[in-house]
Amino acid sequence: MKIGVYPGSFDPVTNGHLDIIERASKIFDKLIVAVLVNPNKTPVFDIEERVELLKETTEHLPNVEVKAFKGLLIDFMKQENAKVIVKGLRAVSDFEYEFQMALLNKKLEPSIETIFMMTNSKYSYLSSSMVKEVARFGGCIEDLVPEKIAKKVMKKLNKKYTEMEEK
């Protein structure tokens, strides 16, 4: 069985992420969307919320599983018996960092491969940070995040930014 892992913080999941997930799910027998607990970031959505949003977003894809993980990605890969990391690239600017990470993962575990997938050009500008920024200033995010979860994401972001402004 070919198992791929698509890691990220997904805070929140965007249409760009979904584009990569849908396309990668056609390549692998099983694709695990690995939601990272990143100690270097303070997420708006906690790990349970991010996992739940991704499960809702990907429920139409029977070979996709969503799991949380912390620690080294290669340790998670071993635990899941996966050999391929899937990384989405929006632009050339993403490549340098992702290339360095791929080389590091290869050094730590030589059996691990990384494949890079270019996002659809209509999402090349899109990031979770941009979704949060648009929401913060009251803009519409319905075309930026999966339709299924747009209202939940907007509600959470509105609440978060209202609380920040009150402080």
Curated annotation (Swiss-Prot):
Q: How does it assemble?
A: Homohexamer.
Q: Which GO terms describe its molecular function?
A: ATP binding; pantetheine-phosphate adenylyltransferase activity
Top EC class per UniProt? transferase
NCBIfam families with a match to the protein in the record: coaD_prev_kdtB, cyt_tran_rel
What are the EC numbers?
Answer: 2.7.7.3
Protein name, UniProt field: Phosphopantetheine adenylyltransferase
Which pathway does the database say it acts in? Answer: Cofactor biosynthesis; coenzyme A biosynthesis; CoA from (R)-pantothenate: step 4/5
- The main place the protein resides is cytoplasm
* Reactions this protein catalyses: (R)-4'-phosphopantetheine + ATP + H(+) = 3'-dephospho-CoA + diphosphate
> Gene of origin?
coaD
What are the residue positions of the site described as Transition state stabilizer? H17
